[in-house]
A protein has these predicted regions:
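One-carbon transfer enzymes
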Residues: 1-87
Length: 87
């Protein structure tokens, strides 16, 4: 079963961990792009993307899904399911 996981906050991390531990075929993790944070307003990775990268997942962070190229990349993963948790 091919899965694309979508989320951004720390709330989504346990769900992704369960899928990994159950050895599901998570093709990619979609998350929101980095956000400006702190006093210096430097860009900071969103929690799920940071976790997914540390676990070796392919991470996509599109600004919008209105772009046909973004949709084409999503389709290229040929997912059977999209799992969305706190996107």
């Amino acid at each position: 079963m091919k899965i694309v996981f979508m989320g951004s906050s720390t709330f989504a991390i346990p769900s992704l961990q369960v899928l990994k531990q159950a050895q599901y075929d998570v093709r990619a993790v979609y998350s929101q792009p980095p956000r400006k944070a702190g006093r210096g307003k430097n860009y900071k990775e969103v929690p799920l993307a940071e976790f997914a990268l540390s676990e070796g997942f392919k991470v996509e962070q599109p600004k919008t899904f209105d772009d046909p190229n973004v949709v084409a990349v999503l389709k290229s993963y040929e997912p059977d399911f999209l799992v969305v948790v706190a996107y």
